[in-house]
A protein has these predicted regions:
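Conserved PLP-enzyme active-site core in the AAT-like
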Residues: 2-25, 52-290
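Internal helical hairpin/lid segments
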Residues: 286-302
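A glycine-/small-polar-enriched, mobile loop at the entrance of the PLP active site in fold-type I
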Residues: 12-50
Length: 302
């Protein structure tokens, strides 16, 4: 079937990789990987573990997973921050009334995209003020304002990465680390340049979400969640199909210590963000090509 069979006329996309126009053309190698993956069955948990190991080698991160988009990665990352390895908290989400649920965010980083974070049960707390926008001065949100907003209900910090984000990420991470809080970075559209993949992972952020589509040219409905082993592991447990026998299941040793998870979780809040084996292999192939030697050419085109 073609678009025309449904009465839809293909358009000339002169806008870029935006989702509303279908994103970028899928890389031909990714398309071939998708077709090949469709011919066989695999255990998705095993596949995601292998993906995590490969992402670790490529990007020098502790762990990673493939989700059904950057927004899905943000929801999963938030769920991991809120629940950790606590089965009762995983089961409770998005009800967070019994444990810390506040996520700090700079007031001028709020947008409709942060609905993905609120969907996990987080309460966003806007920090600071932007005097530039109001015409009242030249100051924007400053690091001390994050510290001043921290309470016993604070679970973490959301940082939206752009070239003009302020304070800079390093200053926010410093405040977070001083208070023992994790930082989740929304970097959905921050590639190219390819260096941002490693730079943001190496920044000290606990979790970073990227789109697997856009310039990477994987399936548009894929995303990467990269970060610490335990938080990525929590996100994975809350996304996987848990229709298994409790006596046969053990928590993946690649993410958790032997006694860290007290049993088998039920289907989690991330169940709706499952990603197919075909999409996983396609985005991993696209990423492999994206990390290749043609980056100078790509940046010139970009």
């Amino acid at each position: 079937m073609k678009y025309e069979d449904l009465g839809v006329v293909p358009i000339i996309n002169a806008c870029g990789t935006v989702t509303r126009l279908g994103g970028a053309p899928l890389h031909t190698a990714a398309l071939a990987a998708y077709d090949s993956a469709a011919q066989h069955s695999v255990a998705i948990e095993e596949l995601q573990i292998a993906v995590s190991q490969q992402l670790s080698q490529w990007l020098d991160c502790e762990a990673g997973l493939i989700a059904s988009g950057a927004a899905a990665a943000l929801t999963l990352g938030t769920a991991a921050i809120l629940a950790g390895s606590d089965l009762a908290r995983m089961e409770a989400l998005p009800d967070t009334t019994q444990f810390p649920n506040e996520i700090l965010i700079a007031c001028d980083q709020r947008s409709g995209y942060d609905h993905a974070v609120r969907a996990a049960g987080a309460k966003l707390v806007a920090v600071g003020m932007n005097e530039v926008v109001s015409g009242a001065g030249v100051r924007r949100v400053e690091p001390w304002e994050y510290a001043a907003a921290i309470t016993d209900q604070t679970a973490g910090i959301l940082y939206v990465q752009t070239d003009c984000s302020r304070p800079i990420l390093a200053d926010v991470i410093r405040v977070a680390q001083e208070h023992g809080l994790p930082v989740l970075v929304d970097a959905a559209g921050e590639i190219p340049p390819v260096e941002n993949l490693k730079r943001l992972v190496d920044s000290g952020a606990d979790l970073v979400a990227f789109s697997g589509g856009k310039a990477m040219r994987g399936p548009q409905a894929t995303g990467l969640l990269l970060g610490t082993r335990t938080l990525v592991g929590s996100a994975l447990l809350q996304m996987l199909d848990m229709d298994d026998h409790p006596q046969l299941w053990t928590a993946p040793a690649e993410f958790f210590a032997a006694d860290e998870v007290g049993g088998m979780p039920r289907h989690g809040i991330g169940r709706g963000f499952k990603v197919s084996k075909e999409s996983i292999m396609a985005v991993m192939t696209a990423l492999e090509k994206f990390l290749g030697p043609q980056q100078a050419t790509l940046m010139n085109v970009w």
